Amino acid sequence: MTTIYKELVAHFGTQDETAAKLGVDQSTVSGWVRGKHGMSPVVAKRAQVLTDGKFKKEDLCPAFPWEVLSAVA
């Protein structure tokens, strides 16, 4: 799973740039890359929008029940 976060960082350039774009601390990005914790649904959605869909929210935050949310929207 950490591979997708490494690819996300590569997309933005650095962990600092990724953090700035996504509105989180650099230490949060480091935690994703190191597999310490996952990404929140809110940040996953933000990443999908900012990357024009290159990174899917479902892939960035697979534990969240996206299909349930879309069924009620």
Curated annotation (Swiss-Prot):
Superkingdom of source? Viruses
GO terms for molecular function, please? DNA binding
Q: What is this protein called?
A: Regulatory protein cro
Q: Which residues cross the membrane?
A: none
Q: What is this protein for, i.e. what is its function? A: Cro represses genes normally expressed in early phage development and is necessary for the late stage of lytic growth. It does this by binding to the OL and OR operators regions normally used by the repressor protein for lysogenic maintenance.
Give the signal peptide, or none: none
Positions in coiled-coil regions = none
Q: Which UniProt keywords apply?
A: DNA-binding, Early protein, Repressor, Transcription, Transcription regulation
From which lineage does this chain's organism come?
Viruses, Duplodnaviria, Heunggongvirae, Uroviricota, Caudoviricetes
Pfam families to which the protein is assigned, alphabetical: YdaS_toxin
Q: Which residues bind DNA?
A: 15-34
Keyword Methyltransferase assigned to the entry: answer is no
